[in-house]
Amino acid sequence: LDWVEEFMREELEPLDLAPLDPYDKQNPHLMAVLRPLQRKVRDKGLWAAHLSPDLGGQGYGQVQLALLNEIVGRSRWAPSVFGSQAPDSGNAEILALFGTDEQKARYLQPLLDGDISSCYSMTEPQGGSDPGLFTTAAVRDGDDWVINGEKWFSSNARYASFFIVMAVTNPEARTHQKMSLFIVPVETPGI
């Protein structure tokens, strides 16, 4: 933790004054600053410490993470530098557990490598985060799904390469069984 303290103080906290957004991974100027910092964190074995080793993380338990997060929580740059930014970390776990091999190659690996950002779209204007009140629906249209509805408070949407969208697919089912998650590339019409 001594190294983390020093790294935060000397390298990351000064960046909080920089005019770059640490979540905009499409910005080449940002990546020129971010990549060397990420390498230092990887070299110390602290990259994505919250994720399991099979996802390239350290599999830290709650106490270890709490001690680390107490320090890294001082800078808005730290989540991008340490590979722990939300919603990317949660989306990585979803993709690792439920994604196809093709989805893992296209979305999970670049996410784990810190090359892209993602977005999780669940909250709705009329229902907040209560899935029992969601109205965004996905219906089959041949081999495709058509999603209709409105999501908001989707963190990092403007920087995301893809969204994971929660939509109602079985409206007659119990609340916890009526939803499905969809990977929606940012270039999809209607986003």
Regions found by a protein language model. Name each.
Residues 69, 92-95, 108, 164, ...:
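Conserved protein kinase catalytic domain
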Residues 88, 103-105, 126-131, 154-156, ...:
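Short, well-ordered, mixed-charge alpha-helical segments that flank or form enzyme active sites
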Residues 1-86, 97, 102-113, 117, ...:
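Amphipathic, small/basic residue-rich leader segments at the start of a protein or domain
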Residues 144, 148-191:
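A short core secondary-structure module
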Residues 54-56, 123-127, 152-153, 168-172:
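Short beta-turn/strand-loop junction motif enriched in small, turn-promoting residues
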Residues 96, 130-134, 157-159, 177:
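Short acidic, glycine/serine/threonine-rich loops at helix termini
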Residues 137-139:
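A structural signal for short hydrophobic beta-strand segments in well-ordered beta-sheet cores
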Residues 79-92, 115-121, 150-163, 180:
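FAD-binding core of FAD-dependent oxidoreductases
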